[in-house]
A protein has these predicted regions:
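Non-catalytic, topology-defining segments of multipass membrane proteins
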Residues: 1-79, 114-217, 284-330
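Membrane-interface elements of multi-pass transporters and channels
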Residues: 59-64, 93-101, 131, 180, ...
Length: 330
């Protein structure tokens, strides 16, 4: 799965890109400009989708009782997708790209997107910066998600079944609960718990006491199940099967983007992931433009691009049974 040297031409630097692919000074100023107002709209949109979806489900099942057999399962699955929206905007906040003012970025990014999505923003930021400094390195916090690929098809399905069943989600939830016992981690856990109280209260206002179960069934449970599946599929598509290198083309996959993938797995342009790893200071709104610059320079070639995510997942699950490594706990 690692691209050969014939697919990795040495064409940098150019007048617009540096040796590593980062934008040169003039282009950098253009690509790194802030998008404060647009991100206010993005945050409002995510909240509207979250609570609007559940409100619509409550209304439909009240008006048409027979629709519950379809409406609630569809809402459950779609709420798993909602956590991708929270996660990516929280990721922007971790890079301090959500708002140009750092205090506003951390305050709004924490309380409006990270904590509702069960993410401790400051702790996540520390780990995520280690990921960007040295993918696949000794301090890589996400290595257990995508190391040792390709694996067998059966192994991938076992991982996805654990995600879908809530087994993986329970590990994450247990870690959050255990954080209350730690003096250093407790402040993060309290903030997340406080945000969940607000979410639960909002859902109670939407559904009434007769639907007290909305938070555990349509917020917590999708986060523990559907979101785990989507997060794994996205994570392995970003870095699975690659290697530690200073050349980001060897650490990060390139996949042609589609509306389907952008809706379910890679919202807010996060699918242009190679561009993000080339320059993590570029806001998500500009990642397609940076990717276009990398292609125009000849640094990203058609040979390293997967036509869609399905083809990449097939490659990641293409190992023979005799080649499978004992990593079933991940």
């Amino acid at each position: 799965m690692i691209p050969g040297p014939e697919l990795l031409p040495d064409v940098l630097p150019t007048d617009r890109l540096t040796q590593t692919g980062r934008p040169a000074v003039e282009l950098r100023a253009e690509l790194r400009r802030s998008h404060n107002l647009r991100n206010v709209v993005n945050i409002v949109s995510v909240w509207a989708q979250s609570f609007g979806l559940i409100a619509l489900a409550c209304w439909l099942t009240t008006q048409l009782a027979w629709s519950a057999l379809v409406v609630w399962p569809v809402t459950f699955v779609l709420m798993g997708r909602v956590f991708a929206l929270y996660a990516i905007l929280g990721h922007e906040a971790a890079h301090r790209l959500l708002f140009s003012d750092k205090r506003v970025n951390d305050l709004v990014g924490g309380w409006a997107v990270a904590y509702p999505g069960f993410v401790p923003l400051a702790a996540y930021r520390r780990g995520h910066m280690a990921h960007h400094r040295d993918e696949f390195g000794p301090n890589e916090p996400d290595l257990n998600l995508y190391e040792n690929y390709p694996i067998t098809r059966a192994s991938l399905w076992r991982k996805l079944r654990r995600d879908a069943s809530g087994s993986s989600g329970w590990k994450n939830l247990k870690g959050l609960l255990n954080a209350f016992r730690s003096d250093t981690a407790r402040p993060f856990a309290i903030r997340i718990a406080a945000a969940q109280v607000v979410v639960a209260a909002a859902l109670l206002a939407i559904g009434g006491w007769g639907r007290w179960w909305l938070w555990p069934a349509l917020w917590l449970a999708p986060w523990m199940t559907v979101w785990r599946v989507l997060n794994r599929l996205r994570g392995i598509a970003e870095h699975g099967g690659l290697m530690r290198s200073e050349d980001r083309r060897l650490t990060t996959h390139t996949v042609r983007q589609s509306l389907w993938a952008r809706f379910w797995i890679v919202p807010f342009n996060t699918g242009w992931h190679l561009a993000h790893h080339v320059d993590s200071g570029v806001p998500f709104q500009q990642l397609p433009n940076l990717h276009g610059e990398l292609v125009a320079a000849g640094w990203v070639t058609p040979g390293v691009e997967y036509p869609n995510y399905r083809s990449l997942w097939r490659a990641l699950a293409s190992a023979e049974a005799t080649e499978r490594l004992p990593q079933e706990e991940n």
